[in-house]
């Protein structure tokens, strides 16, 4: 399978290194913008501003996509969803196995802890510009879905604020070279349950993206998630 790597940043470089070392896939393009590159799959670790051009290129050339970029808005998400009617797409803010298992865990225990206060804390390196992280947003979404979409998000806190039982607090920390830490904390009366995942290397994201690319081979157009990739 020939892979087009969209983006030339740190994650794209790590993905390139992993693919070359693995030897199963062939890199046919490594760029921020595609012109005449041909390939069987696009793996995207770019910037949300570059997504529209990539999506248009994908549809024009009928190339499936693994989209790992975060920070896009609802308008961009709608474009991705529309594109999935033309080509198969895996959309994931975090392709590592551990985080996707964490999503499953918190979605299962949240209904049993309805009376607990829920907080999400995410920590990343000092070069990450978007906050909260796409992974933290995904954690909120799976918890909210499990709680009948009754919850609402509060990003950080400032000033006088009485906590509502229906709110989930979201907090972003930026510093140093942290690859990515995510915690979901359930605060009850006299007990605390914390589910935490720490990433110690970016290679886990590259490995997950490769797994997603292999999953898409032969798939019909549609929007797929890592839950389906790992099933």
Curated annotation (Swiss-Prot):
Name of the molecule in the record: 4-hydroxy-tetrahydrodipicolinate reductase
One GO cellular component term noted in the UniProt record for this chain: cytosol
Catalytic function, reaction form: (S)-2,3,4,5-tetrahydrodipicolinate + NAD(+) + H2O = (2S,4S)-4-hydroxy-2,3,4,5-tetrahydrodipicolinate + NADH + H(+); (S)-2,3,4,5-tetrahydrodipicolinate + NADP(+) + H2O = (2S,4S)-4-hydroxy-2,3,4,5-tetrahydrodipicolinate + NADPH + H(+)
InterPro entries, per database record: DapB_C, DapB_N, DapB_N_CS, DHDPR_bac, NAD(P)-bd_dom_sf
One GO biological process term: diaminopimelate biosynthetic process
Biological source species: Brachyspira hyodysenteriae (strain ATCC 49526 / WA1)
Keywords (A to Z) from UniProt: Amino-acid biosynthesis, Cytoplasm, Diaminopimelate biosynthesis, Lysine biosynthesis, NAD, NADP, Oxidoreductase
Record localization: Cytoplasm
Listed EC numbers: 1.17.1.8
Active-site residues annotated for this sequence: 124 (proton donor/acceptor), 128 (proton donor)
Residues given in the record as NAD(+) binding sites: 33, 68-70, 92-95
Gene: dapB
PANTHER family recorded: 4-HYDROXY-TETRAHYDRODIPICOLINATE REDUCTASE, DIHYDRODIPICOLINATE REDUCTASE
Role noted for this protein: Catalyzes the conversion of 4-hydroxy-tetrahydrodipicolinate (HTPA) to tetrahydrodipicolinate.
UniProt xrefs under Pfam families: DapB_C (PF05173), DapB_N (PF01113)
Pathway field: Amino-acid biosynthesis; L-lysine biosynthesis via DAP pathway; (S)-tetrahydrodipicolinate from L-aspartate: step 4/4
HAMAP family assigned to the protein according to its UniProt record, in alphabetical order: DapB (MF_00102)
Enzyme category, top tier: oxidoreductase
Gene Ontology molecular functions: 4-hydroxy-tetrahydrodipicolinate reductase; NAD binding; NADP binding; oxidoreductase activity, acting on CH or CH2 groups, NAD or NADP as acceptor
Binding site for (S)-2,3,4,5-tetrahydrodipicolinate: 125, 134-135
Chief location: cytoplasm
Family stated for the protein in its record: Belongs to the DapB family.
């Amino acid at each position: 399978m020939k892979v087009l790597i969209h983006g030339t940043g740190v994650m794209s470089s790590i993905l390139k290194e992993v693919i070359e070392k693995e030897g199963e896939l062939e890199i046919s393009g490594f760029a921020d913008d595609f012109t005449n590159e041909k390939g069987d799959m696009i793996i995207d670790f770019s910037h949300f501003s570059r997504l529209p051009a990539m999506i248009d290129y994908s549809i024009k050339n009928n190339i499936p996509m693994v989209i790992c970029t975060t920070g896009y808005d609802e308008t961009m998400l709608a474009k991705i969803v529309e594109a999935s009617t033309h080509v198969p797409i895996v959309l994931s803010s975090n392709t590592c196995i551990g985080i996707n298992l964490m999503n499953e865990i918190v979605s299962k225990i949240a209904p049993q802890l309805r009376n607990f206060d829920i907080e999400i804390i995410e920590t990343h390196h000092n070069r990450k510009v978007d906050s909260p992280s796409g992974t933290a947003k995904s954690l909120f979404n799976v918890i909210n879905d499990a709680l009948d979409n009754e919850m609402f998000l509060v990003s950080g806190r400032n000033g006088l604020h009485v906590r509502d039982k229906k709110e989930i607090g979201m907090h972003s920390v930026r510093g140093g070279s942290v690859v990515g830490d995510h915690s979901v904390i359930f605060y009850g009366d006299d007990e605390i349950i914390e589910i935490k995942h720490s990433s110690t290397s970016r290679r886990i994201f590259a490995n997950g993206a490769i797994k997603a690319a292999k999953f898409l081979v032969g798939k019909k157009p549609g929007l797929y998630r890592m839950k389906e990739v790992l099933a």
